[in-house]
Amino acid sequence: MGNCAIVGINWGDEGKGRMVDLLTESYDIVIRYQGGGNAGHTVINEYGKFALHLLPSGIFRKGVVNILGNGVALDPENLWKEIEEVTAKGVPITPENLKISDRASLLLPWHRELDGLEEARLADKKYGSTKQGIAPFYSDKYQKKTIMAGELLYPEHLTEHLTDLLGWKNLTLAGVYGAEPVKVAELREWIDTYCEKIKPFICDIGAFLRKAQADGKDILFEAQLGALRDLDYGIYPYTTSSNAIASYAPVGSGLPSAKIGEVIGVVKAYSTCVGEGPFVCEMFGAEAEALREAGFEYGAKTGRPRRVGPIDIVATRYGVQVQAATNIALTKLDVLSYLDKIPVCTHYTVGSKETDEFPFPSVLDSAKPVIEYMDGWKCDISGIRKWEDLPVAAQRYVEFIEKEIGCHVGFISVGPERDSIIIR
């Protein structure tokens, strides 16, 4: 089987969780290698419907080891709440099927507070943060001002490190934002409440993965968000603060030597976007509301309405290139079944010129979409499981996307359930 990465091609919310949940039966290990609790992976299976924000989507599969790698923004409070929600539905979670890298850094309460304070300061120039503390966390990590999960196992060192960090962080909270400084006792109580609970899951992931690799175990790398939200290759500064691309997976997982054989890029059959920033193909008014309702496009974390539009071939082709995708999973094709004509953004107009190249972020604000229309199929396709049974118009839509983005579409989802999938 070999190693595989499942990544987002666009702005996130493409349906990566349902693809990981589907494919994990063929893998031994699933690793979340970046990001934090700022986005949700929706999974529907025999246990129910879940929006996973930190837990890897392989947690429902018996015999699969799930790992939170060193690249993750580890929020002990929200992780523990998520563990409780999932186990309450009958899913076993133990140190045997969930492991946390001792090199993952902790997202602390002040990271969430700073996120909210900075968004408030930016006012109408805000980035549209989910206020889960992701940007302040990664800023601190690269300043070497965080606590690593492994430090929880060495309390005598932890106390000294916390005291030093707190003095430094309060300079920002009180001095820059005028907020109340955090007290050592408050932070200690938070650690005792949440961090103590996750200690049994913390281990040397590097050693575990090196042995797994030597034993021939197959690894599935699960990304958060998508290529257009990647810190380096996305629509900066309207990005996340980590690297959501497949090439970062070995580094963020704890196994830098890992080779990725297949990269499955997940693409929604239309475009959605949460947060601020350029969104060239955005729909408005009744047309947007109809698509949003048909696809139930509301944020898994925030519940806020997603911005929607037709599939953006220019952005999707760029995402495929950045991710070096070898296969595409096209999700939510069934949502478009209500349309007589299906809009597709094939090019951009920038100034007086038409382009099929994804522009530099500063240019995107002035780019205009070139829209073409394809025939719809106007029938329920949610029960179809074979390619040849799809309406001809649906096949042509998939084949058009495949040709334009230059990558084979090997999976097509026609519903939210695990088995609502066509494999080509």
Which residues fall in each region the model found?
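Non-transmembrane, aqueous-exposed alpha-helical and coiled segments at domain scale
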Residues: 1-424
